[in-house]
């Protein structure tokens, strides 16, 4: 597509022997877009995207002008169409996305169209990283055993992905055992400046030119934001939005407010990037940045590596922002070189960024932001976050005290908090606060050599003093790329990590996403028999309830060195700032300060062992896979041959009976309430990723289809089968439905509800199916921050398939709100100060929403009529959170995929 180029900014840039076409921001400023050089760097990337894609339809001149107007007001509610350069997926979200594409090919044929039109138009990379589970640990055979188990459990899914790789163009699969998608993206896939050949006229010459532009992406995982640390603008979206982008649909969004986060000073000795990101997360959650861009600026950036920046950018979902952006600077150029990017690409990035005013130096003027806040890096202290929120940062000396308070207040364990309990067949006892999982895991930290080498050096020092992990601790090391394993092995540090218990268990997300695997049976039994509040310490990004392990209630985020330290100590009830980790082989107490490595030593190891040659070697055959992958056979065909007996991959029902013209939207009349939830309901609560209980609706379904409980696998691997996922919706073991609140104030946990008007208690799935038989529409009520966490489109898909027409809450997290719209579910918010609780709702009410027929507008005020069981009526004002005109089109079509399919079939 050739831009209309209203601001005459199409120019050429010569880099070495090559000439590139680009859309010059400085030229656009001279030609009418006054002051745009003062924009935040992230907004400049959005502006370039609009200039390059101006077509008079999805991108008009007025949209481009709106960005300069934003500058004057520092905020502007204006809808734009953003076209990312590419799409990134992981397998938990990628499998259902490919299922949707396969189903769309079938639906396209039924509508009389060409199935080949359902094909990615931009590059799509799917990295298989979510399926490996830590079933084995603690020895050098653990890795191979876990790989064998992974292929055994996921053969059918992997065959399907191999079919997709062959059937769709522009679609590549990075096989299992390679790494975590965001780390592979940072270390290999991302280019910072992207190029594409296009036919166009430049000056008087018409032909094919190579166009250079900022690398950008959306991903089907919320931590796609990590790559903003390398100045690549990107964020997580639901799979359905990603599919629409793949098929040529621009991403509809409002111009964001941009919060400037000024960093000054430098971190003190012994402080890590993990401590910094937990501090940033706490500060930004307190400020409130949902739906906003955060951009980091200030002199402190000169003291951060790209790996440090990537750690901060990674946790944008945890602080609530759309992204946390860092501009191109000298550190970015150094990282591109160190990570083995081709020299011509590195030269292009440097030249392009400087030509566009996208290159930050110490002398660069501060951009104009909507608002700002400041952090002196010298104020950051060693920290952890827990026991159940990423923003719950606690300074290291206060962790033990914080757990003690939580034990009494959160977990209601007030009697004998220090009591120890026997473990069958073992000589040790365990108690509250004992660390039963210590995991070096997650791209958040394993992408950062400083904390990995720090952990290795700490392990070396601990082993030298005779320390090792306590026997009740399940230890694991799962790096985000093979590069990490290489430099740990080459440096000799892996051998020391092995000595204290941290053997390699796999390359993938593992414990961070709940794939921690089962605890040893005797430990699990002791925990559950005695009601022990056990702890996990992990170098991940999320510690929500029920996420890490069903046996663990208290979860703490920490740097890799602190993960090792807590494995040695064996408990979060010790103040590691002053109490010993244990007793050395000389009989003397060993303190954390005795074994903590210096930054000088860490940097020396990094300089010697983290080299471009390792990156080049490990990524040379990134798409090839191991022998297990290469053995997988698949049938090449335009449309997928669905196996009706499969419990992993099924043709979803979204397009059944679909016509070329959408059915008119109807009002919601006398809907029943399916569930009433509190604040901070995560997408994990709505659609869990972990283990499937035998007694759950999903477990019963699998049993009925002759699947043994040992082969249930987990919800995340079953996302290609709507029958399992519908039954798993709202089935998290920790979710609480306030409709079931007893007279004593207690609320049972798990996916339960009451069916009305009979008041019978049953599973949420069973109630939803009963309502469907009765042809009764449904709504869900919730509190604040509904749908935070993972970009899990099944949280919206499952909601829709249960028959829910609307979700009414105090506030939504960004991705889940757009996912609901993308599935044709109406998101609504209460006015400030109103909640279902303040209205006195009990759950037996009927809800009517009118005004959906005809002239519905984005962000329109609507009125709900709520009739209680006693016949009393309340009228409640609600805000329609369909935010843009494009979203309104999606809603009227029954969802974004229906909209795109009709458009392609026309």
UniProtKB/Swiss-Prot annotation:
What pathway is this protein said to act in by its record? Carbohydrate metabolism; tricarboxylic acid cycle; isocitrate from oxaloacetate: step 2/2; Organic acid metabolism; propanoate degradation
Q: Which GO terms describe its cellular component?
A: cytosol
UniProt remark on cofactor binding: Binds 1 [4Fe-4S] cluster per subunit.
> What function is annotated for this protein?
Involved in the catabolism of short chain fatty acids (SCFA) via the tricarboxylic acid (TCA)(acetyl degradation route) and probably via the 2-methylcitrate cycle I (propionate degradation route). Catalyzes the reversible isomerization of citrate to isocitrate via cis-aconitate. Could catalyze the hydration of 2-methyl-cis-aconitate to yield (2R,3S)-2-methylisocitrate. The apo form of AcnA functions as a RNA-binding regulatory protein.
Q: Which PANTHER family match?
A: ACONITASE/IRON-RESPONSIVE ELEMENT FAMILY MEMBER (PTHR11670)
**Self-association or partners: how does it assemble?**
Monomer.
Question: What is this protein identified as?
Answer: Aconitate hydratase A
Q: Which gene encodes it?
A: acnA
């Amino acid at each position: 597509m050739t831009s209309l180029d209203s601001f005459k900014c199409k120019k050429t840039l010569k880099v070495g022997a090559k000439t590139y076409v680009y859309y010059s921001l400085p030229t656009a400023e001279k030609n009418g877009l006054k002051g745009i050089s003062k924009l935040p760097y992230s907004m400049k990337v959005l502006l370039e995207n609009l200039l390059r894609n101006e077509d008079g339809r999805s991108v008009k001149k007025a949209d481009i002008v709106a960005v300069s107007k934003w500058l004057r007001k520092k905020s502007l509610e204006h809808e734009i169409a953003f076209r990312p350069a590419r799409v990134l997926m992981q397998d938990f979200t990628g499998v259902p996305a490919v299922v949707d594409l396969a189903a769309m090919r079938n639906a396209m044929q039924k509508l009389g169209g060409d199935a080949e039109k359902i094909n990615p138009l931009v590059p799509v990379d799917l990295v298989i990283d979510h399926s490996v589970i830590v079933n084995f640990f603690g020895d050098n055979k653990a890795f191979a055993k876990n790989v064998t188990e992974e292929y055994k459990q996921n053969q059918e899914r992997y065959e399907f992905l191999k079919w997709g790789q062959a059937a769709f163009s522009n679609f590549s699969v990075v096989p299992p055992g390679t790494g975590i998608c965001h780390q592979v993206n940072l270390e290999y896939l991302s280019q910072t400046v992207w190029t594409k050949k296009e036919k166009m006229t430049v000056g008087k010459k018409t032909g094919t030119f190579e166009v250079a532009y900022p690398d950008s992406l959306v991903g089907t995982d919320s931590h796609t934001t990590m790559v903003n640390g390398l100045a690549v603008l990107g964020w997580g979206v639901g799979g359905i939005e990603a599919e629409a982008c793949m098929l040529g649909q621009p991403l509809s969004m409002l111009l964001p407010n941009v919060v400037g986060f000024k960093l000054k000073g430098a971190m003190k000795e012994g402080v890590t990037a993990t401590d910094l990101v937990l501090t940033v997360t706490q500060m930004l959650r307190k400020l409130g940045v949902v739906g906003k861009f955060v951009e980091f600026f200030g002199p402190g950036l000169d003291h951060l590596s790209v790996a440090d920046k990537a750690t901060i950018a990674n946790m944008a979902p945890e602080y609530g922002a759309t992204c946390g952006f860092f501009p191109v600077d000298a550190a970015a150029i150094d990282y591109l070189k160190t990570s083995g990017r081709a020299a011509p690409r590195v030269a292009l990035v440097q030249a392009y960024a400087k030509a566009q005013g996208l290159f930050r130096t110490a002398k660069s003027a501060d951009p104009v932001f909507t608002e700002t806040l400041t952090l002196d890096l010298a104020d950051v202290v060693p920290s952890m976050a827990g026991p159940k929120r990423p923003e719950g940062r606690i300074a290291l000396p206060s962790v033990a005290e914080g757990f003690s308070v939580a034990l009494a207040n959160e977990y209601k364990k007030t009697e004998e908090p220090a009591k120890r309990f026997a473990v069958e067949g073992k000589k040790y006892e365990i108690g509250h606060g004992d660390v039963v999982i210590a995991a070096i895991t997650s791209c958040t930290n394993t992408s950062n050599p400083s904390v990995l080498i720090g952990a290795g050096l700490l392990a070396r020092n601990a082993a030298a003093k005779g320390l090792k992990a306590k026997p009740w601790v399940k230890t694991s090391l799962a790096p985000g790329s093979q590069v990490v394993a290489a430099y740990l092995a080459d440096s000799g540090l892996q051998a020391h990590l092995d000595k204290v218990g941290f053997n390699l268990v796999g390359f993938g997300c593992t414990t961070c996403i709940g794939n921690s695997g089962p605890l040893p049976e005797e430990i699990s039994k002791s925990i559950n028999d005695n009601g022990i509040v056990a702890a996990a310490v992990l170098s991940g990004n999320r510690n929500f309830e029920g996420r890490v392990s069903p046996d663990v209630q208290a979860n703490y985020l920490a740097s890799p060195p602190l993960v090792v330290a807590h494995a040695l100590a064996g408990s979060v009830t010790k103040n590691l700032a002053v109490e010993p980790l244990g007793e050395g082989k000389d009989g003397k107490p060993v303190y954390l300060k005795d074994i903590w490595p210096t930054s000088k030593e860490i940097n020396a190891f990094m300089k010697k062992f983290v080299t471009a040659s390792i990156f080049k070697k490990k990524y040379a055959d990134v798409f090839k896979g191991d022998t297990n992958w290469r053995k997988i056979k698949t049938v090449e065909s335009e449309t997928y041959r669905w196996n009706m007996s499969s419990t992993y991959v099924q043709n979803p029902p979204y397009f059944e009976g679909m016509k070329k013209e959408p059915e008119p939207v109807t009002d919601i009349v006398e809907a029943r309430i399916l569930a009433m939830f509190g604040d901070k309901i995560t997408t994990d609560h709505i659609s869990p990723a972990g283990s499937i209980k035998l007694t759950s609706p999903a477990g019963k379904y699998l049993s009925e289809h002759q699947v043994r409980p040992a082969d249930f696998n987990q919800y995340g691997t079953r996302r290609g089968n709507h029958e399992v996922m519908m039954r798993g919706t709202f089935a998290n073991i920790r979710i609480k439905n306030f409709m079931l609140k007893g007279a004593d104030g207690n609320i049972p946990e798990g996916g339960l509800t009451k069916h009305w008007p009979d008041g019978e208690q049953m599973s949420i799935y069973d109630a939803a199916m009963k309502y469907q038989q009765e042809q009764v529409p449904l709504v869900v009520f919730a509190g604040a921050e509904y749908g935070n966490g993972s970009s899990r489109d099944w949280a919206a898909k499952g909601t829709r398939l249960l028959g829910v027409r609307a979700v009414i809450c105090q506030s939504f997290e960004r991705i889940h709100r757009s996912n609901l719209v993308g599935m044709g579910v109406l998101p609504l918010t209460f006015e400030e100060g109103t909640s279902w609780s303040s209205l006195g709702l009990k759950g037996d009410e009927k809800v009517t929403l009118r005004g959906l027929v005809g002239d519905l507008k984005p962000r329109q005020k609507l009125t709900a009529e709520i009739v209680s069981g006693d016949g009393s009526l309340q009228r409640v004002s609600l805000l329609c959170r369909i935010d843009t005109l494009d979203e309104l089109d999606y809603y009227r079509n029954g969802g974004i995929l229906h909209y795109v399919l009709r458009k392609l079939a026309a």
